[in-house]
A protein has these predicted regions:
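One-carbon transfer enzymes
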Residues: 1-112
Length: 112
């Protein structure tokens, strides 16, 4: 049974999990990642590895600066109706209301 999954992640470490969920046939209803950051000598805006891969997979991407304070983004994500959230190295603390939203809960993959 394919699940509707909301994926949260930022660095390259999180990309294989996103790809595996996508390959398994689950419906990724959204990908939440950190906003583009300025890096390098030219201070160019560089997207996260997860954002880059999500766009290649034609998945909807959300980049809240601070999810705890962005109530509009929280509502948009709730409206996606995900069955499950999968979090892998997102980089922000998720508010309780976000954690409680999916009926099947949230799964956190941690590298430590």
């Amino acid at each position: 049974m394919a699940l509707k999954i909301l994926f949260w992640g930022t660095p390259i470490y999180a990309v294989p999990t996103l790809e595996a969920l996508h390959r398994a046939g689950h419906r990724i209803v959204g990908v939440v990642t950190q906003p583009d950051r300025r890096r390098g000598r030219g201070r160019q805006l560089i997207p996260s590895a997860v954002k880059t891969r999500a766009l290649e997979l034609a998945l909807p991407v959300f980049t809240p600066e601070k999810i705890r304070q962005d109530h509009s983004c929280q509502q948009q994500l709730a409206d996606l109706g995900a069955d499950l959230s999968v979090v892998v190295a997102f980089g922000q603390i998720l508010p309780v209301q976000v954690l409680r939203q999916p009926p099947l809960g949230c799964w956190n993959g941690h590298g430590s």
